[in-house]
């Protein structure tokens, strides 16, 4: 790698990107027909969307994009926050996202028999 000097007056380096947070992602499971998310959208259990944990402070705004990566297999996808969850912290890992069943499966989560959660990293993209 070759170092390149910054132009005079430029900042020495851009701030380092914050490390991705490790946490548990769960999934919704069956929802009644016509269910709405907290953002008012019709719930789609196959969409790449998620609820953010109410234990997160501050809350991620609706529409925030988050890259979620399964630590066990490296599978990754970007989900859009459109709901709020009611999760609680656990001694092992905080619960951070409640994924749709489709997103959970695409990341390698097992629905039947239900493994309950997967350990993920999450990176807020914007």
What residue spans do the PLM features occupy?
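Secreted/periplasmic proteins
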Residues: 1-126
């Amino acid at each position: 790698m070759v170092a390149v000097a910054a132009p005079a007056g430029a900042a020495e380096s851009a701030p380092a990107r914050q490390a991705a947070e490790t946490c548990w992602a769960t999934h919704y499971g069956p929802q009644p027909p016509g269910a709405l998310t907290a953002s008012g959208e019709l719930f789609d259990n196959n969409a790449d969307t998620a609820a953010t944990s109410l234990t997160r402070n501050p809350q991620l705004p609706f529409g925030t994009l988050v890259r979620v990566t399964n630590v066990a297999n490296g599978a990754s996808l970007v989900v859009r926050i459109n709901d709020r969850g009611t999760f609680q912290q656990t001694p092992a890992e905080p619960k951070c996202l409640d994924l749709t069943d489709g997103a959970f499966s695409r990341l390698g989560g097992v629905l039947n028999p239900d493994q309950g959660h997967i350990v993920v990293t999450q990176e807020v993209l914007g």
